[in-house]
């Protein structure tokens, strides 16, 4: 199963995260199938590849709870349902 989850990078105590599509059995920082965005919790900065995320969600990828919250804030699920309806 493919998951959309956070991959940690950055210095100690200054973590940032990449939002990646990855096999659910892979390690947290393992090689992703695709990098779909960036999240910095210290500054609340978020950059998303929305078309790529929509494509992965339509293929059946499951977001983790944290990634789901980020996507809800960015209204990505509305775009998924709009794409599915048309």
Swiss-Prot record:
Q: What does the sequence similarity comment in the record state about its family? A: Belongs to the bacterial ribosomal protein bS16 family.
Query: Which Gene3D superfamilies does this one have?
Result: 3.30.1320.10
Q: Name one GO cellular component term.
A: cytoplasm
Q: Which organism is it from?
A: Nostoc punctiforme (strain ATCC 29133 / PCC 73102)
> The organism sits in which domain of life?
Bacteria
GO molecular function terms here? structural constituent of ribosome
Name the UniProt key words of this record, in alphabetical order. Ribonucleoprotein, Ribosomal protein
Question: What is one Gene Ontology biological process annotated in the Swiss-Prot or TrEMBL record?
Answer: translation
Recorded hits in Pfam families, A to Z, give: Ribosomal_S16 (PF00886)
Protein name listed in UniProt: Small ribosomal subunit protein bS16
Which InterPro entries is this protein grouped with? Ribosomal_bS16, Ribosomal_bS16_CS, Ribosomal_bS16_dom_sf
